């Protein structure tokens, strides 16, 4: 799934109107590029952090002010647009007492106000497992949602650890108990229902049920540039080996609005996410985005089907990150390289084609995607002058000595999404090909 999410874009201003306005905007401007999902995050029954929840609003009773027509109405409207409705859930706790808790007080393991709730269930309690959890999970489908984001996993494990001796079955570890809950949810929803775990504050929250979830949030909320560098980039380097091998690693929303980013920073965030083929979740109020930032979204959609080359945790230099994507097609193989300046000052970076990109010694055509500039035929290395927090994304293609493509404009992969056939006919001296493009989107072939 790729598309808009409420929390990062509008936070506690999320409501039916905001969701449907962004869904309609996404349908008109981004759906043809690959944005196919709308995520309703936790505001549907939460109104603030660290407070006792309002009476009458809980998992089974969405906020009637924010969603006056109910969640089924919202999901249906999203689906009418041809988009996938997705829902945030936190079924291991409740923000306020409700009928189930009042009738089954022994199902509550801890009553303690946390960011997401106050009543935390005993994961091993039979009534929780056999009554509350199935009812909560079934509601997702009853309301018409086709994907979910299961949050509150770290704090659930925290309280399960702290109050472990009071569990109905303390012989189970906290991870085993939570895994059983996830396993039951998966059985109810089926194998084809997309489930995203959230969030990965530590390794165990990502790994305890990696085989049961389809995707995993691998870090905390990312808004400003420092959070992007210290959490987003760092967590990707640590967990990328799992991406598209065991799970889809989700490093958090792509937030590019001017409130949190210069244009260079917005380009850098978009580039790093896209070149690595990570999930694209949009974290801005879409109608408010300036046109040049909407353009960034068009060039990173759809998410690439990329797999890691490394089987272990990666590292990077303190002043830069180089993300190297190899694209292999029947007609050509080339590299797309994101060079990210981590410094808030100018930075000269030299990329060694053999040492950094693992390319054979030879001549290569190098094209700068964002600056729309051909950097020439390169041997050995290429040196870049990067502005503070800026990125350059390069297409690096083996020099063939005949007319050939150096880049295309549709996608940051510079042919990975759009090029379907390419061939040079020596007899006629013609370069021929077939591209899949988006209607109304200007398309350039750079050769």
Q: PLM features: what roles do these ranges have?
A:
Residues 1-107, 113, 120, 280-282, ...:
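Conserved structural scaffold segments of CAZyme catalytic domains across common CAZy folds
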Residues 29-32, 139-144, 360:
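Alpha-helix termination/capping residues and helix-transition junctions
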Residues 370, 375-377, 383-447:
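Non-catalytic C-terminal accessory domains or segments of carbohydrate-active enzymes
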Residues 171-400:
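Active-site-proximal substrate-binding groove within the catalytic cores of carbohydrate-active enzymes
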Residues 77, 142-144, 189, 197, ...:
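Solvent-exposed loop and beta-edge segments used for protein-protein assembly and interaction
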Residues 11-15, 283-285, 374, 441-446:
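Short amphipathic alpha-helical segments with coiled-coil-like heptad repeat character
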Residues 33, 346, 359, 440-441:
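A cross-taxa feature marking solvent-exposed loop/turn segments within ectodomains of secreted
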Residues 37-258, 265:
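Aromatic- and carboxylate-enriched substrate-binding clefts and catalytic-loop regions
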């Amino acid at each position: 799934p790729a598309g808009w999410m409420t929390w990062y874009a509008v936070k506690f201003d999320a409501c039916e109107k905001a969701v449907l306005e962004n869904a309609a905007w996404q349908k008109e401007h981004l759906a043809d590029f690959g944005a196919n999902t709308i995520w309703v995050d936790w505001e549907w029954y939460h109104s603030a952090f660290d407070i006792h929840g309002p009476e009458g609003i809980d998992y089974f009773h969405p906020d009637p002010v924010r969603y006056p027509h109910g969640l089924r109405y919202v999901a249906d409207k999203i689906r009418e647009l041809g988009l996938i409705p997705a829902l945030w859930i936190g079924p291991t706790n409740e923000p306020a007492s409700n009928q189930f808790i009042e009738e089954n007080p022994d199902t509550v393991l801890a009553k303690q106000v946390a960011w997401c709730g106050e009543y935390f269930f005993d994961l091993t309690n039979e009534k929780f497992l056999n009554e509350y959890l199935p009812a909560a999970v079934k509601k997702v489908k009853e309301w018409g949602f086709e994907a979910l984001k299961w949050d509150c996993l770290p704090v659930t494990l925290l309280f399960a650890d702290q109050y472990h001796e009071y569990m109905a079955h303390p012989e189970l570890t906290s991870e085993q108990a939570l895994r059983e809950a996830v396993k039951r949810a998966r059985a109810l929803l089926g194998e084809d229902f997309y489930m995203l775990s959230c969030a990965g504050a530590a390794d165990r929250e990502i790994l305890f049920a990696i085989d049961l979830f389809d995707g995993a949030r691998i870090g905390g909320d990312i808004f400003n540039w420092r959070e992007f560098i210290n959490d987003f980039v760092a967590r990707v380097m640590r967990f990328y080996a799992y991406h598209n091998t065991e799970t889809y690693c989700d490093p958090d929303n792509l937030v590019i609005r001017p409130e949190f980013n210069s244009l260079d920073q917005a380009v850098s965030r978009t580039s790093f996410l896209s070149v690595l083929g990570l999930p694209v979740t949009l974290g801005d109020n879409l109608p408010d985005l300036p046109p040049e930032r909407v353009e960034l979204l068009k060039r990173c959609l759809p998410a690439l089907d990329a797999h890691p080359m490394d089987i272990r945790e990666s590292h990077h230099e303190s002043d830069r990150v180089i993300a190297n994507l190899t694209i292999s097609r029947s007609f050509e193989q080339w590299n797309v390289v994101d060079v990210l300046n981590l410094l808030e000052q100018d930075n000269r970076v030299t990329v060694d084609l053999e040492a950094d990109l693992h390319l054979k010694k030879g001549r290569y055509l190098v094209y700068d995607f964002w600056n729309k500039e051909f950097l020439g035929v390169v041997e050995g290395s290429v040196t870049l002058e990067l502005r503070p927090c800026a990125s350059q994304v390069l297409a690096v293609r083996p020099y063939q000595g005949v007319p050939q493509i150096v880049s295309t404009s549709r996608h940051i992969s510079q042919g990975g999404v759009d090029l379907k056939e390419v061939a040079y006919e020596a007899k006629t001296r013609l370069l021929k090909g077939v591209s899949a493009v988006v209607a109304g989107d200007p398309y350039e072939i750079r050769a």
